[in-house]
Design a protein with these regions (language model features):
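Short coil/turn linking the two alpha-helices of tandem helical-hairpin repeats
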Residues: 25-37, 67, 72-81, 111-129, ...
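Terminal, low-structured helical/coil segments at or just beyond the last alpha-helical repeat
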Residues: 160-223
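Alpha-helical repeat scaffolds
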Residues: 6-8, 42-50, 83-94, 126-140, ...
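Short coil turns that delineate tetratricopeptide repeat
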Residues: 50, 54-58, 101, 144, ...
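Extracytoplasmic/periplasmic/luminal assembly and interaction segments
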Residues: 29-32, 36-91
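Hydrophobic membrane-insertion alpha-helices, especially the h-region
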Residues: 1-15
């Protein structure tokens, strides 16, 4: 009985310490949404999340946060290092997905990572076809109305439009419509599409969705 109680105390202590490190990493990621990260800040966040994983190696959220930190590192990295860091991010997200397969945001991030990897390596585009399909379908299955999923499928879907079959194209159209219509995604997605000079195309495709949605943000380009 005493040994069981000691184990419970030890486990709670481990989880508590892991949580402190995890919160430190998560706060850093939130701060970078407003003030871009620096390499030294990314390094500190890496150290924090690695400690969280050491104390709680089966916690899926810590691997998800690790993947996000690697994404920032890839953004800041020199060109020759980008591929290696993106692969590390993908590995972290896959670890998270293995432990929490129904979390849609993880599949959305994996979809974006796969697109980035193929953009840096044309030879990988063909080999990524199955991964694209798996990540997109899982994101859609587990989070069909999740803003992160709507945005990821819209962005990657348009960027790789020519490679999709008919069913996949209709899936992209569905998420374009949801993303441009959703109050928590419409402005972020529209800003991205405008910066990529794809806004009118996206609105035109979204208008094909049946039943139609009244996508007010597209009114200016669909008159």
């Amino acid at each position: 009985m005493a040994s069981s109680a000691l184990w419970v105390i030890y486990f709670a202590f481990q989880q508590g310490i892991a949580s402190l490190y995890g919160v430190t990493a998560e706060k850093a990621l939130l701060a970078w949404n407003h003030s871009p990260a620096t390499l030294s800040a990314v390094d500190d966040a890496h150290k924090a999340i690695q400690r969280a994983i050491e104390y709680s190696p089966e916690h899926p959220q810590y691997y998800f946060l690790q993947g996000r930190i690697f994404q920032w590192q890839a953004y800041l990295a020199q060109d020759q290092d980008t591929q290696q860091v993106l692969h590390a991010a993908k590995t972290a997200f896959l670890e998270s997905a293995e432990r929490r397969p129904t979390w849609p945001d993880t599949w959305a991030e994996l979809l974006k990572i796969e697109a980035q990897l193929s953009a840096h390596d044309a030879a990988q585009l063909h080999s990524s076809k199955d991964s694209f399909d798996k990540f997109m379908r899982n994101a859609d299955q587990y989070g069909p109305y999740t803003p992160a999923v709507n945005i990821a499928i819209s962005q990657v879907g348009l960027a790789h439009w020519k490679q999709w079959d008919s069913e996949q194209k209709w899936l992209v159209i569905e998420h374009l419509a949801r993303g441009l219509d959703g109050k928590n995604s419409r402005h972020l997605l529209a800003d991205y599409l405008k910066s990529a000079h794809q806004f009118k195309l996206a609105c035109t495709l979204a208008s094909r969705r049946e039943p139609k949605l009244e996508i007010s943000i597209c009114n200016s380009v669909l008159k």
